[in-house]
């Protein structure tokens, strides 16, 4: 305020002139051409088979981006050179789950058709949003491969509960949007799945890496193997990150927490590794419930997933 140099608006944050916050490099979409990466929220969680406030996640993850800088000390790289788009959120129907999923598919399909250079980063929401999002991605991009980080197969039958957060990949397989041989599941965890769904995955040619595999072989080795396999038969790769792939100590704000999961450093290294591959052109982050979280730990981890993905893409562009 003029004449009062030390008076500022209420709750004004501290500002360091030499620090750019990650949230500052995402600009609201002006409706013009999107050239590169862009966030879009899909705040649907009514389709969860357990209590979930994941519909609040897009807002909180965006907020958490402001908690971190754009500079990677590990790679001596500043993401501030990027201009990224935030397309906002897809409006969900208050009561209609199938209708909400249809809105996601319609919006994503139109955007991917009209904005062919757009590489989406979709913020769920529960994992049910991956079905319409990936279906739209496949429609626009041709033959796709999917790398799924998850504690669960998410191949539940559709008869018992309909299209919920436990069915996205079954829906993709049964609609023909995705071929089983083009789906790689990483981080599948003990006592979090059932035998019939493991057999379903095997029957359809889904490649499954359990946490035992990750611990024994290392995530980067597994990712190199998975990407090499997919590159022989797909045009692009989409990465779906269910945050419950992380151990409950690292992601307390997931509806389906459990022990024996991945640590956050391993996941972030894997996401960075995938980001460096030009075939990887889309991603979603799901199953973050801010109402269950502790000090926004899970939302902050999700924000770091975004930053490490973009770091990989930035390394690729200058390398």
Curated annotation (Swiss-Prot):
**Superkingdom field:** Bacteria
Q: What class of enzyme is it?
A: hydrolase
Q: What keywords does the record list, in alphabetical order?
A: Histidine metabolism, Hydrolase, Manganese, Metal-binding
Pfam families (alphabetical): Arginase (PF00491)
- Reaction catalyzed: N-formimidoyl-L-glutamate + H2O = formamide + L-glutamate
State its role: Catalyzes the conversion of N-formimidoyl-L-glutamate to L-glutamate and formamide.
Q: Which PANTHER family match?
A: ARGINASE/AGMATINASE, FORMIMIDOYLGLUTAMASE
What protein is this chain from?
Answer: Formimidoylglutamase
Q: Which organism is it from?
A: Halalkalibacterium halodurans (strain ATCC BAA-125 / DSM 18197 / FERM 7344 / JCM 9153 / C-125)
Q: Give me the gene this protein comes from.
A: hutG
